[in-house]
């Protein structure tokens, strides 16, 4: 459990209280199989979400009734029988089946990274929730090592971009090169066209270079010249940055900061962890090897289950209350108006929902509890709540504001 802020345990309901919630609904759908026998498949009721083992079209489906029929019949979803509700137990079983790679991946990460449990958990959550992650900390805290280890443990394309003050946007997205032989332009794609992109020390480059990532991070596509190219289905930007007080750094544009699902503060290791680091790394010949544990396809399948994790209406309202409390704290009886310059954007609502579902997934549950939301609130919101000059003068941070909101709002 995350202990970064004090929680009133008496206000967190027992998990049994959530068992009576209406179960998530699913749609029964037919799908064409190789044996041509009509079978049933599940869609969890989300427009872009399918059961983790099958890929289905939410709006229509095809049925091949027999080997003699060569033309599939396309039927509208409107003519189908009412959907059957999926029980919490069935959701839990789906989570258990699709999370087989979580434990081996954590063990592989811990082989090279000592301590930093919260960092590792946050990286996995960003992977499952299909959101980008920003790591902030002083140099030497294994930020880059953690991201490189994660990328190596996944069977996917990985590119590293070392941000420097003299970079150009074309160094990231690519450019068009004139070909005098054929008298035309050819497109040379940049390192952003990968499954995993490590933006190392992203705030070492000026804003115009940092902004080259904006389109790819939000729309999962990149425009070079007059051509637009899609990015891979599994696409994750993992960025590191040094605190802004460090010499030679540039603040990230607000539009880019808001595109990161999580901002994780990487802290120094404990004395016991540092002793283990000394024992393992105290040699001039350090050999760090990483085994591939999971494929991009497995991650894609797990994401479908994460999207289907059930969230009760009261839990959804709790998320909305947290976000709105950052914009209008007086409405919730909080005297924080003078300390908040800007509250969280709607992206905060979406990302807090997705990361809470991923947190439930890694804990083996098919439903979200208020504790999942509290666990993720700081990482999702700390870079979305801008504090005023009064707050800075009094030493009040966005984390202090978020913590007070979490400790004040009633828990469903």
Which functions belong to the PLM regions below?
Residues 77-87, 330-412:
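C-terminal engagement/docking regions of AAA+ P-loop ATPases
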Residues 94-97, 112, 249, 263-336, ...:
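Conserved C-terminal "switch" segment of AAA+ ATPases
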Residues 96-133, 138:
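Pre-Walker A (pre-P-loop) alpha-helix and adjacent loop at the N terminus of AAA/AAA+ ATPase modules
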Residues 128-164:
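Walker A/P-loop
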Residues 157-169, 226-230:
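Short beta-strand-centered segment that lines the nucleotide-binding/catalytic pocket of NTP-utilizing
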Residues 179-198:
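Conserved alpha-helical scaffold flanking the Walker A/P-loop in AAA+ ATPase domains
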Residues 179-183, 205, 209, 217-308, ...:
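Canonical AAA+ ATPase core
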Residues 200-201, 212:
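Walker B catalytic acidic pair
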């Amino acid at each position: 459990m995350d202990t970064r802020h004090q929680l009133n345990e008496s206000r967190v309901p027992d998990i049994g209280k959530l068992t009576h919630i209406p179960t998530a609904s699913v749609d029964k759908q037919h799908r064409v199989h190789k044996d041509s026998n009509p079978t049933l498949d599940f869609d969890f009721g989300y427009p872009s979400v399918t059961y983790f083992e099958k890929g289905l079209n939410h709006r229509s489906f095809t049925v091949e009734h027999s080997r003699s029929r060569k033309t599939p019949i396309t039927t509208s979803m409107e003519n189908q029988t009412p959907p059957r509700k999926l029980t919490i137990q069935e959701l839990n079983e789906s989570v258990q089946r699709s999370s087989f790679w979580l434990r081996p991946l954590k063990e592989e990460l811990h082989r090279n990274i000592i301590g930093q449990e919260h960092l590792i958990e946050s990286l996995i959550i960003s992977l499952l929730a299909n959101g980008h992650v920003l790591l902030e900390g002083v140099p030497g805290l294994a930020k880059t090592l953690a991201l490189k280890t994660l990328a190596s443990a996944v069977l996917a394309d990985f590119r590293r971009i070392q941000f420097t003050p003299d970079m150009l946007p074309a160094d990231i997205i690519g450019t068009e090169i004139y070909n005098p032989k054929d008298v035309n332009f050819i497109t040379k794609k940049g390192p952003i066209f990968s499954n995993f992109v490590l933006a190392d020390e992203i705030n070492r480059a000026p804003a115009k270079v940092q902004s080259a990532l904006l389109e790819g991070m939000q729309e999962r596509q990149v425009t070079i010249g007059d051509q637009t190219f899609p990015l891979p289905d599994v696409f994750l930007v993992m960025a590191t940055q040094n605190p802004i007080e460090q010499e030679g750094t540039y603040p990230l544009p607000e539009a880019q900061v808001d595109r990161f699902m999580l901002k994780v503060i990487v802290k120094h290791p404990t004395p016991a962890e540092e002793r283990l680091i000394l024992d393992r790394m105290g040699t001039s010949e350090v050999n760090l090897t990483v085994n591939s544990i999971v494929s991009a396809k497995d991650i894609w399948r797990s994401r479908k289950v994460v999207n289907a994790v059930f969230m009760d209406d009261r839990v959804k309202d709790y998320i909305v209350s947290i976000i709105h409390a950052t914009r209008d704290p007086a409405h919730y009886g909080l005297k924080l108006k003078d300390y908040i310059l800007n509250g969280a954007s709607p992206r905060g609502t979406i990302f807090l929902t997705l990361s809470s579902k991923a947190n439930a997934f890694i804990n083996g549950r098919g439903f979200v509890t208020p504790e999942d939301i509290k666990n993720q609130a700081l990482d999702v919101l700390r870079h979305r709540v801008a504090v005023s000059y009064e707050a800075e003068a009094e030493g009040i941070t966005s984390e202090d504001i978020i913590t007070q909101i979490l400790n004040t709002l009633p828990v469903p």
